[in-house]
């Protein structure tokens, strides 16, 4: 996307394409972080400004500070801190170039006012969230995914879970927590068709979490038994096919796992419990 995935967008989405058991909140490289967060268009503009500052005729000490900061940015996300931005701004080329006076026309003032009010609006929502007033922050700024996720974990009824999960998925459909919540709500009302759809979406975004597969099996096993008791063999067979397919899904995940995933401390472990294997053997 030309304007990136947004703040924490990569962290929220990486479960859908990861090839090992890991969790990455920051990539520890400011250039890559900018590309992920704000996209390639703003990043290119930033690179042009920095390169211009490096080649410009300005004090050597300013260039040394700038190059040192840039070198460290390749190993950490320094620009997450406002103070680092201030240092970067001081080191940019402010001494050369043409001076141009811009008159503030009515349209320009209107745009400035909208930007200021928008920043204040988002800032109020963020301040409420970081001060622990999650519900109030969502009322002010309902597009805060993290706040929505906190409210989801606090939901007490299936209706509340569904409502918060839908709001989260409207913002980012790669969040497994929301799909799990919808599956749990569907399980509570006995809608196993929805359970299958929602758990498959959850598994697509949490490929290396064994508990997800076990939870799916447990829900399907209950569905299978209930359908058999009701004489609905067609629906029971759908549940059974999904149960048997769990191991096939695991095999596909392991086949696509990167070789490096087996060399780190947290290695993939997706061995289903004996209860699963016994169930499959008994119903072949």
Language model feature labels by segment:
Residues 40-67, 211, 217:
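Hydrophobic transmembrane alpha-helices and their immediate junctions
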Residues 141-284:
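C-terminal luminal/periplasmic domains and tails of membrane-associated envelope-modifying transferases
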Residues 1-24, 31, 38-44:
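TM-adjacent membrane-interface loops and short helices in multi-pass inner/ER membrane proteins
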